[in-house]
Every structure is written in C-alpha cells, then in structure tokens.
Amino acid sequence: FNYTRKQSLSNAERFVTPELKEMESKLLSAQDKMVKLEYVLFTQIRDYIKKDVHTLQDVAKVIARIDVYQSLAMISSENSYVRPIFNQSKTFNVVDGRHGVIERVMAEGSYVSNDVMIDNNYPVLLITGPNMGGKSTYMRQIALIALMGQIGCFVPCSEANIPIFDQIFTRIGASDDLISGQSTFMVEMLEANNALRYATENSLIIFDEIGRGTATFDGMAIAQAMIEYIATSIKCITLFSTHYHELTFLEEKDLGIKNVHASAS
C-alpha cells in the first residue's frame, strides 16, 4: 500500500500514502486560492460601491431612524404607554407610573404602579422606607419616564405632565472601581460631586442612599449637607432616598423639601 511513516505519537503512529499526500497538497492549494479569490472579490465590490458610499450611508441613517421609530411605536402600543405633556415649570406629575423593564419581567398584573407629584413648592423629595421597599425602583421609574419622553417615546403611565430637563444626574447603586483604585465611598463622592457641580435649576438629580459607604454619622452629615445644598443653591427637581430617618426633620426647615415614605406589605 506504499505506507510511509509520517509521525510518531506517544500512543500511535501516523502513516501517509502518495495518494493522501497528493490530496493534502490539492486541499492546501485550494484553500490558498480561495483566500486570494475572496480578497479579489472584496476589492472589486469595494471599488464598485465606493462611488455611492455617501448615498449608502444616508440610506443606512434613514433605515436606522425608521428602526428606532418603529421600536418606540411597538413598545408603546404593546404596553399601553401614553404621550406625555411637557410644561415649562418644575411640575412633574405622573399618574400610575411604572418601571417599563421591571413590569415586563414580573407576572402580568402584579406590578404596583405609583403616582408622582412634584411642584415648585417642594422640588426635593426625601424618600425613606425599608430595604426592598421600592425606593430605588421608584426613582429609576421617574428617570426613565423623563428620558423616554424627551427622546420622543410614549411613557409607561396613565397620565404624564413633565418638564424638559437639560441634564439628568444619577447616583444609584454601590460599587468600587478596582482598576482606578477607588473605593465604594470614593466612587460615590465623585459621582455626587459631578452632579452638584454641573446641575442647574432645570436638571434632574437622583441620589440613592448617599453616605452609606462610610461611617454612620459621617454619612448622615454628608447626606444632610448635600440635600440642603441642592434645596438652597441648585433648586432643581431631586429625588433623594436615604436610610437616615433622622433627616426627615429637614421638611420643617421650609427649604422646599418634602418627606415621602415607601412602605412594603
């Protein structure tokens, strides 16, 4: 059979025949020719469409825009979203507001909707409540409704009368940044500082559990200082959740701060 030893392995021997060597050569040659042919075809197609590249890019942009509009229309229709009304004041009123993502993963009809009523007199909401009581979801829901409305999408609620925000700042969750060598508390302070420095009276600020990354009384002092600064200097719509129930006295200082409580049943 004209077998020739080709390779010795620890548990086997490999042999080859002239016919197999010829077949191997043909296969390798065919693969090389295929790669070269693919490149030739690629360059031909590239040169052919080069003259129309700007037209194709314009078409792609139109298709992308249609895709976005279709997606927004479909999600709004399937989930009974409504068209928001925009106002020029700091009035943020939502009836039966929902978190569009969470309600999709819960059993149908089990999501509990929430109203939102914020006006010029009390633009800052101080939110307290137990863990897993829905504070973070409530705030995320408001941010999503604001963002969805401003990109031209209907929003998940029964009614919505909301302002147009120039910026939305959020400080939600607790995580460190090991790559940058930043602790959980450092990340928290940097993100909060960004909001306090650049927010205007037309911005939306959402702070979730500020100060929990450090000692109890230090965190409480930081949280109080931030909320008082927002209420007296920035004066924008703000949702500030906290587990420091001692801060609820701030409502009595007439700074435009209103206490709200999330209860779990």
Language-model features, listed with the residues they occupy:
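A conserved P-loop NTPase coupling/switch region
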Residues: 1-62, 88
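ATPase nucleotide-binding head domains, primarily ABC-like/P-loop NTPase cores
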Residues: 2-13, 20, 69-265
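Well-ordered, non-transmembrane segments within structured domains
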Residues: 51, 65, 145-146
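Interdomain "pre-motor" coupling segment immediately N-terminal to P-loop NTPase/helicase cores
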Residues: 55-77
